[in-house]
Amino acid sequence: MTKKILLNAFLFIAILLASALMLLPAMLDKSMNPVSEHAPFVVSVEAQELHGSLIVGDWHADSALWNRDLKKAYDYGHADIPRLQAGNVALQMFTTVTKSPSGQNYDSNESGANDNITALAIVQRWPIKTWSSLFERAMYQANKIKDLEKRDPENFMLIESQYDLGIFLLKRVNNPKMVGGLIGTEGSHALDGNLENIERLYENSFRMMSLQHF
């Protein structure tokens, strides 16, 4: 009887933990990346026409850090393909987040401080190799963006060269809603202290590296 009670208790705890791991990533994402509700902005016809005539580019989005399908529209977070299209954003730089020290601030950060991304990677069930390697974290996030192009080629194109950019702009003439994406690093933590990783990142579609983040 005691064994049966213990087994049932173990199963209950296991189910509870599994449920928490399934729900926690989205809960964290929604709490840390809310979108403020507001009344519709008043935009003049002239401003709308001007905005619609521009090739708009945004150079920072941490969207690949989170467990989201960027093909879908969300009511939280920075960006996804439907919202980029709605805002007439033609080019989006997807930056890979690999390290964020506990207590991060604008004045002073300790290099030995606990890293927030490690816990987030574990909670979001990233591959084990990303738990200890900043380079692998960058690669994992970049692969999400490359996979997005494979799954949604009508709406998204990864740009890796000047030639790609030209092709993208031609495609956008017939499909004004197409979004072009680039991949970059947020800070150079992804090098993991090894300059040879610059070449490895380039070979894996990275085209921008910010030298410092904090």
Segments (PLM) and residue ranges:
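N-terminal hydrophobic targeting/anchoring segments and the immediately downstream early-domain regions
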Residues: T2-F214
